[in-house]
Each structure stands twice: as structure tokens, then as C-alpha cells.
UniProtKB/Swiss-Prot annotation:
It comes from Penicillium oxalicum. Its cofactor is pyridoxal 5'-phosphate. Its EC number is 2.6.1.-. Belongs to the class-IV pyridoxal-phosphate-dependent aminotransferase family. The modification N6-(pyridoxal phosphate)lysine is found at K193. Keywords: Aminotransferase, Pyridoxal phosphate, Transferase. GO terms for molecular function: branched-chain-amino-acid transaminase activity. Induction: Expression is positively regulated by the oxaleimides biosynthesis cluster-specific transcription factor poxB. The lineage of its organism: Eukaryota, Fungi, Dikarya, Ascomycota, Pezizomycotina. GO terms for biological process: branched-chain amino acid metabolic process. This is Aminotransferase poxL. PANTHER family: AMINO ACID AMINOTRANSFERASE, BRANCHED-CHAIN-AMINO-ACID AMINOTRANSFERASE 3, CHLOROPLASTIC-RELATED.
Length: 365
């Protein structure tokens, strides 16, 4: 049986374009446990629901020993389901785990666990012609009880899934530079996807939203002169050099390696655009014709303006005559077409998902 024949179709009674990011019940999630004695992760198991049982004295809850990822699965016009760039997410999560002293999940096991979670929840993968996707949340944490600041005896790796629409939508948003709060320290953990980099941003993001700004933008914490990233997305600047397009991506040890940004870089080169990966000075912002917020949740969102209160700066990025942002629109369409099977996957970014039985290892006698 072909994978597309195994998977049930997406339910037609759901308004897929307006499901938002509300947490809802699905068929279950996947769990693996780490064995300290054998220094290995257990085989993935499907667990019903989305709840976990965890010690109140786990280092995950007490010391923030956790790392996570964000990725997506899609359905193509033929009904096949696939995951977008899982190997890159596996590598990034392995790095994040090392930063917070969690045993890294081997790439093969990471991808197998993610694919299993998608497979058992196949009916929650939206139709290919909707604006929604199946969001995937791999999570690893120290789970064994441990009151002192030391390595626990137990670790858990889980994969949860949830159908969602885009976090920020597709219309341009206004950004506010954070000046009262630094997201990370110069030699800190800013290049890891760990909760400690995001929870402190919540109140500042809420304050920005209350003032009408859709997303905070962070400068480097050492000099406040260079662009790091948005609070929940990577930064890309677009420069028009006499008709020649150049995209500029920050090179900083304090930001995560954005999978969407990397996808944009590869696409840009395939278009014949120039690509610069280097530190970006704050003073360069007015030189850009477009600024993009890019990420798994946001995909690609054009920035309408950037405000810096201390300097009373307001940098506006005007749309073209037709109301669009040409580079953002081109990159967005290319990525979405590949993700949904509407365009040729020339980079081999999409990994097909099979029936659940394909992801369980046979038990030896």
C-alpha cells in the first residue's frame, strides 16, 4: 500500500484556513527515554493524549534543562505527507541539547520519532490547498528528580503535533527594537533553541503589542550596534543595488541557525541573487528595500517599519505599487510551493512519511 493510500484525508468539516494556533487534542504523541547505563535512547513509543507525567523536582522544571524544535509537515495534491527539512532540525536540536547538557538525540532516531508522531496523527495534516500545516514540536528535557544542580538519571524526548495556521499571518508587521532587555549574553546560550531564551521575552513582547508593534527586534547585547534577530524569527535584509538583489543575513554567535533563513539563502542563490552572511550594523537598516522576519512559525513576513525609541528613529519599508514586497513574495511562494508539492523539490528538502509500522524497530528474539 502506498503511503498516500494509507493516510486518511484531512477532515472537510474543519475551517483549515482559520484554525489559528489553538492547542487541540490529537491522537497522541511520541516518547523516548534515555538510559544512563547504556547511554542510549529507547525506541519511540506512541502515548495517547498530550499530557506528561514528570517529577516536580526534575531539572527541566527547576533549572530549565530543556531544548526544543519547531518544524512542519504538509500534504501534497496526491495525498502524500512529508516533513520539511527534518535533518537540519535534528542537527540544530542536537546542538541545543549539548548546550543544556542533555544527551543529544541521534539524527536517525530524531527523524524516525518525528515521522512516527506525524504518521499516527495523519488526519490532522491539513489539505494541501489550505494555508495551514501540521506543526511539530520535538522536546527534550531532564526528567529524573534531582534537587542539586547536577546531571539527572533520566531524560525524556517527546514529539507533539498540532495543526496550525501561520503565527504572524502574511501582512506586513511593525517591529520595535528592544532596548530595556537583552535576549542573550555575548557568550551565552543564544544560539540554542531553549526555553530560557524565550520566556523572559514574553512580557516585553506583550508591551510591544500593546503599543501596536507585532514583533520585537533584538540588537547585540554587547554594543547595541548590530542586528541579532526578532524575538520569534530570524532577520533578513534585502538590498536593491541598481537592479541587483542582495539579501543580507546576520552572522552572530548569539542567534539560532534559522532553517527558514537557510532555505531563503539557498533559494536566493538559485535566483542569481547575491547573498551576504555577516554582522549587520543598525545604521544599515535604512539601506534595505525590504526586511523579512523568517521562521518555521512565521514562514516569511515582511516588516512594515522598525522603531527605535531612544533615537526617535522610524524606518519605513514601503510596499511596491501593487501593495506587495517583491522579494518576500517570491521567497514565500517558492518555499510554500515546495512544502505543498506544487513546485519541484530541487533541494530535496521534503522527506515522505510512511505508515506507523515503518518506524518501529523489530524486537530481537
Amino acid at each position: 500500500m502506498a503511503p498516500k493510500d494509507f493516510f486518511p484525508p484531512a477532515p472537510l468539516d474543519l475551517d483549515w484556513d482559520n484554525i489559528g494556533i489553538k492547542v487541540r487534542e490529537v491522537n497522541g504523541h511520541v516518547e523516548c527515554a534515555y538510559n544512563v547505563a547504556t547511554e542510549s535512547w529507547s525506541e519511540p513509543q506512541v502515548v495517547k493524549g498530550i499530557d506528561l507525567t514528570i517529577s516536580g523536582l526534575s531539572p527541566a522544571l527547576n533549572y530549565g534543562q530543556q531544548a526544543y524544535e519547531g518544524m512542519k509537515a504538509f500534504r501534497d495534491p496526491q495525498g502524500q505527507i512529508h516533513i520539511f527539512r527534518p535533518e537540519v532540525h535534528a542537527a540544530r536540536m542536537a546542538h541545543s541539547c549539548e548546550v543544556v547538557s542533555i544527551p543529544p538525540i541521534p539524527q536517525a532516531q530524531f527523524i524516525r520519532s518525528v515521522a512516527l508522531a506525524v504518521s499516527v496523527n495523519a488526519e490532522f495534516v491539513p489539505p494541501f490547498d489550505s494555508s495551514a500545516a501540521l506543526y511539530i514540536r520535538p522536546l527534550a528535557f531532564g526528567s529524573g528528580p534531582q534537587i542539586n544542580l547536577a546531571q539527572p538519571e533520566e531524560y525524556t524526548f517527546c514529539v507533539f503535533v498540532l495543526p496550525v495556521t501561520s503565527l504572524l499571518g502574511t501582512k506586513p508587521v511593525d517591529a520595535l527594537i528592544m532596548e530595556e532587555f537583552d535576549r542573550t549574553a555575548p557568550m551565552g546560550s543564544g544560539n540554542a533553541k531553549v526555553g530560557g531564551n524565550y520566556a523572559p521575552v514574553l512580557r516585553w513582547a506583550a508591551k510591544a503589542r500593546a503599543r501596536g508593534y507585532g514583533i520585537p527586534l533584538h540588537l547585540d547585547s554587547k554594543t547595541r550596534t548590530e542586528i541579532d534577530e526578532f524575538s520569534a524569527a530570524g532577520f533578513i535584509g534585502v538590498r536593491d543595488d541598481d537592479g541587483k538583489t542582495t539579501i543580507v543575513v546576520p552572522d552572530s554567535s548569539c542567534i539560532i541557525q534559522s532553517v527558514t533563513s537557510d532555505s531563503c539563502v539557498q533559494l536566493a542563490r538559485s535566483y542569481g541573487w547575491s547573498v551576504e552572511v555577516r554582522p549587520i550594523k543598525y545604521t544599515e537598516l535604512p539601506e534595505f528595500s525590504e526586511v523579512l522576519a523568517v521562521g518555521t512559525a512565521a514562514v516569511i513576513v515582511p516588516i512594515g517599519s522598525i522603531t527605535r525609541d531612544s533615537l526617535r528613529d522610524l524606518i519605513v519599508y514601503k510596499p511596491s505599487e501593487d501593495g506587495g514586497y517583491p522579494c518576500a513574495d517570491k521567497l514565500f511562494k517558492s518555499i510554500k510551493d515546495i512544502q505543498r508539492g506544487l513546485g519541484k523539490d530541487v533541494f530535496n528538502w521534503c522527506v515522505p512519511v510512511h505508515e506507523p509500522g515503518a518506524y518501529f524497530q523489530p524486537v530481537s528474539a
